[in-house]
């Protein structure tokens, strides 16, 4: 099962006491801030959680799986996530508190 933005907003509504509208807006603003920071080429560091980075992938050779034709895969930027030590430990230990 995946956690959705709507579910995060619902948790904020239930646990923090924000209105449903404010909770939804807060979640949207949070993710928009991450998007804008990455778009500007900066790293996002969430203490105790992990880091989002942009990585440049160079052009490389590829192949069309249907035709077998060689095609170049163009250079591009990709978003990477590196979990922090606290997150890694909690996931590895199965700790839910």
From Swiss-Prot:
SMART domains: BHL. One of its GO terms (molecular function) is DNA binding. Keywords: DNA recombination, DNA-binding, Transcription, Transcription regulation, Translation regulation. InterPro entries: Hist_DNA-bd, Histone-like_DNA-bd_CS, IHF-like_DNA-bd_dom_sf, IHF_alpha. GO terms for cellular component: cytosol. GO terms for biological process: DNA recombination; positive regulation of metabolic process; regulation of DNA-templated transcription; regulation of translation. Pfam families: Bac_DNA_binding (PF00216). The keyword RNA-binding does not apply. Belongs to the bacterial histone-like protein family. Heterodimer of an alpha and a beta chain. This protein is one of the two subunits of integration host factor, a specific DNA-binding protein that functions in genetic recombination as well as in transcriptional and translational control. This is Integration host factor subunit alpha. It comes from Colwellia psychrerythraea (strain 34H / ATCC BAA-681).
């Amino acid at each position: 099962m995946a956690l959705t933005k709507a579910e995060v907003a619902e948790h904020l509504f239930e646990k923090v006491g924000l209105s449903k509208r404010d909770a939804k807006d807060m979640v949207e603003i949070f993710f928009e801030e991450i998007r804008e920071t990455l778009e500007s080429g900066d790293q996002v560091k969430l203490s105790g959680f992990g880091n989002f980075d942009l990585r440049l992938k160079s052009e490389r050779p590829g192949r069309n799986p249907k035709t077998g034709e060689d095609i170049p895969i163009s250079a591009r930027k990709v978003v990477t996530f590196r979990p922090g030590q606290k997150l890694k430990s909690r996931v590895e230990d199965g700790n839910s508190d």
